[in-house]
Amino acid sequence: MPYAAVNGTELHYRIDGDRHGNAPWIVLSNSLGSDLSMWTPQVAALSKHFRVLRYDTRGHGHSEAPKGPYTIEQLTGDVLGLMDTLKIARANFCGVSMGGLTGVALAARHANRLERVVLSNTAARIGSPEVWVPRAAKARTEGMLALADAVLPRWFTADYIEREPVVLAMIRDVFVHTDKEGYASNCDAIDATDLRPEAPGIKVPALVISGTHDLAATPAQGRELAQAIPGARYVELDASHISNIEKAEAFTKTVLDFLTEQE
C-alpha cells in the first residue's frame, strides 16, 4: 500500500488509471468514519477519463491518526501536500460529507489548485456543537462500536439497508475499525468549521449534490450552499447521506457529466 509523509502524518493513498498518462486528475475525499474504499463504485468509470487519486483522510483507514483535535486547515493541507508529493499541479476534487467540507475550503482558499469541485452531501457548516462535542467524547471514552448503531442508520435509507446487508456489513466494519482518536479529532475539525462567509467567494466551477432523505446534511443545506457559490449547479438524488454508494450509477453519471462537459 502506498503512503506519503504529509505535514508530519503518514497518509495512505491509491491511484487508479494511467498514472503516467495525460488524463486530468481527480482527488476523492472520504466521509467521516469511512475510508477510500467508499469510492469503489465510481473508480472504474472515473478512471476511463481521469487519473484517480483516493486517500484516507488523517485518522481514517490506513492513514496515521495523530492526536487531535484536527482543523480544516490540516485537512486541506493534507490534500495539497499529497498533491505536491505526487507532483499534481491541479486536479478536480470530489468529496462526500466531511470530504465535501474539505472541498469547500479548498475551493474558497486554494482555487489555483482546482479545476472543478463536486461537493456531495455536505454544507458550508455541518451540524452544531450539540452534535459534535458529545459524539467526539463518546468516541474517545467508549470507542467506535458504541456509536455504530446510532450513526450508520442515518447514512442510508431503510429500503437500502434492508436490500444491501452485505454492503452495510462492510461499511460497518470500516466504521468500527476507524481509530477512535482520529474519528473524534475529525469531529472536532468539523465542529470548528463554518465556511458560510467564504462560500460566496468561490470561483471554481462547482456541483453540489444532496440526498433527498439526508438528515446529516439536508437538501436545504445543499441548496443553500449551491445558491451561495456563484454559478454552482445543484442536483438532488433519491438517497440518504452516502449517496455515492446508495445511488452509485446516478451519482457517477452526474459527476462525470459535470466534469467532462465542454465549457
List each language-model region with its residue ranges.
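Conserved alpha/beta-hydrolase catalytic His-Asp/Glu region
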Residues: 127-130, 142-201
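Conserved HGGG/HGGXW glycine-rich cap/lid loop of the alpha/beta-hydrolase fold
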Residues: 9-64
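Flexible "cap/lid" loop of the alpha/beta hydrolase fold
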Residues: 101-109, 113-148
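Acidic catalytic loop of the alpha/beta-hydrolase fold
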Residues: 212-217
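Short beta-strand/loop motif that positions the catalytic acidic residue
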Residues: 202, 208-210
